Amino acid sequence: MLYQQISQNKQRTVVLLVVFFALLALIGASAGYLLLDNYAMGLVLALVIGVIYATSMIFQSTSLVMSMNSAREVTEKEAPGFFHIVEDMAMVAQIPMPRVFIIEDPSLNAFATGSSPQNAAVAATTGLLEVMNREELEGVIGHEISHIRNYDIRISTIAVALASAVTVISSIGGRMLWYGGGSRRQRDDGDDDVLRIITLLLSLLSLLLAPLVASLIQLAISRQREYLADASSVELTRNPQGMIKALEKLQLSQPMKHPVDDASAALYINEPRKKRSFSSLFSTHPPIEERIERLKNM
C-alpha cells in the first residue's frame, strides 16, 4: 500500500505538469492568434517565457530563501539532537547532508529548500524542536528529506514559474488587445466565417480563465507532493505512527509569528499562516486530517 501511494502521487504530478504545459501552450497560441494572427509564434513565445521564468526561479539562492524566512544556520554543537536526526535521515535517503537552520518561532513547523540534493537545506522552528519527541521529529525531518530526495522543491518551483508565466502572458495579451487590438476585432466583426468567430471567442475565454486554472493546477501539484513526502517519510523511518503523531501535533499549532509570503508558505510541512475557510482547492496543503487518514490506511 505504501509503495502504491508513492507511485500514484508521482503519476498524478506528471499528469498535472503535462496539463500545465498544455495550458501554457494554449494561452500562448490564443495570444498569438488574437495579437499576431499567428498561433505558432504565440506558442513559441509562451514556452520561452515559461522556461526563462522556471530557470531563474530554480537557481534562486538557498541562503536567500532562508534569509526571507528569518532562519539562521546552526552547527552540530549548537543543535546536536536536530542535527543528528537530519544527518540520519539524509543517510537513509542516500543524499548529501543538507545545511541545517533554525527559525526562532514558537509555532510548530519545518521546511526544506534547494533545487537539488547538492545544495539543499532543512529548517525547523524552535517550537517544533521543543514540543516534538525524537520519533515525531524523525517523521517531520523524514518528510523534509523526502522533499529533497524527490526533487519536490524543483517541481514546485517549476509549477509556480509556469503559473506566473501564464498570468503574465494573459495579462499582457489582454492589455494589448484592449488598447491596440481594434483592427483584429473590426476585421472579425464583419467576417461571416463562423469558425473564425468561434475561435476568437474561445481565445478570449482562454485569456480570461487561464490564470485561475494555472493557479489551481499549481496548488494541486503542491498538495500531491505533500502526500508523497508523508508516504516517503514513512518509507525512510519505517514508522507511520511517528508521522501520524507529528501531524496530530501540527494540527494544533498556531500560525507563525513572522510574515510568510505565498512562495515560502508552500514549502512548509504545515500551512504557516492563519487557516483559511474556503475550499481546499485553493490551499497549498491538503487537510491534515486527510493526510493522517492516508497514513493510517497504509
From Swiss-Prot:
Tell me which residues this entry annotates as catalytic.
E144
Per UniProt, Zn(2+) binds at H143, H147, E226
Cellular component terms, GO, for this chain's entry?
plasma membrane
Cofactor annotation comment: Binds 1 zinc ion per subunit.
Catalytic class of the enzyme:
hydrolase
> Main subcellular localization, coarse class?
membrane
Question: Which BP terms in the Gene Ontology apply to this protein?
Answer: proteolysis
Single GO term (MF): zinc ion binding
Q: List the disulfide bonds.
A: none
- Localization annotation: Cell membrane
The cofactor required is: Zn(2+)
Q: Could you tell me the membrane topology recorded for this protein?
A: Multi-pass membrane protein
Record bears the keyword DNA-binding: no
Which UniProt key words apply to this protein?
Cell membrane, Hydrolase, Membrane, Metal-binding, Metalloprotease, Protease, Transmembrane, Transmembrane helix, Zinc
Spell out where the chain crosses the membrane.
14-34, 39-59, 158-178, 197-217
HAMAP family membership: Pept_M48_protease_HtpX
Output this protein's name: Protease HtpX homolog
